Amino acid sequence: MAKKPTQDFESTLKELEAIVSHLETGELPLEEALNEFETAVKLVQQGQERLQKAEQRIQILLNKNDQAELSDYE
């Protein structure tokens, strides 16, 4: 089976939101709900990986410019 090409972060987030909404209805049969949950877990992992890569890129860019400083978002 061919691997599904990875989506951009925004598409991943939209698909995850749709799955959550679908699951929240409580109207899915158990097996379908489990399949949706499994898909959601994979999407969360993809999203986290993308965010980590973005953070690494930001760190690299900031390290090239020693005047810039990364601070926690409040």
Curated annotation (Swiss-Prot):
Catalysed conversion reaction: Exonucleolytic cleavage in either 5'- to 3'- or 3'- to 5'-direction to yield nucleoside 5'-phosphates
UniProt-listed InterPro entries: Exonuc_VII_S (IPR003761), Exonuc_VII_ssu_sf (IPR037004)
Entry annotated with the keyword Endoplasmic reticulum: no
GO cellular component: cytosol; exodeoxyribonuclease VII complex
Keyword DNA damage set for record: no
Cell compartment(s), UniProt: Cytoplasm
GO terms of molecular function: exodeoxyribonuclease VII activity
Pfam families per UniProt: Exonuc_VII_S (PF02609)
SUPFAM superfamilies (alphabetical): XseB-like
Enzyme class: hydrolase
A biological-process GO annotation: DNA catabolic process
Annotated EC: 3.1.11.6
Signal peptide extent: none
Source domain of life: Bacteria
Transmembrane segments: none
Keyword list, A-Z: Cytoplasm, Exonuclease, Hydrolase, Nuclease
NCBIfam families tied to this protein: PRK00977.1-1, PRK00977.1-4, xseB
Function: Bidirectionally degrades single-stranded DNA into large acid-insoluble oligonucleotides, which are then degraded further into small acid-soluble oligonucleotides.
Family as reported in the entry's similarity comment: Belongs to the XseB family.
Subunit field text: Heterooligomer composed of large and small subunits.
Record-linked HAMAP family: Exonuc_7_S
The protein's name in its UniProt record: Exodeoxyribonuclease 7 small subunit
Native species: Actinobacillus pleuropneumoniae serotype 5b (strain L20)
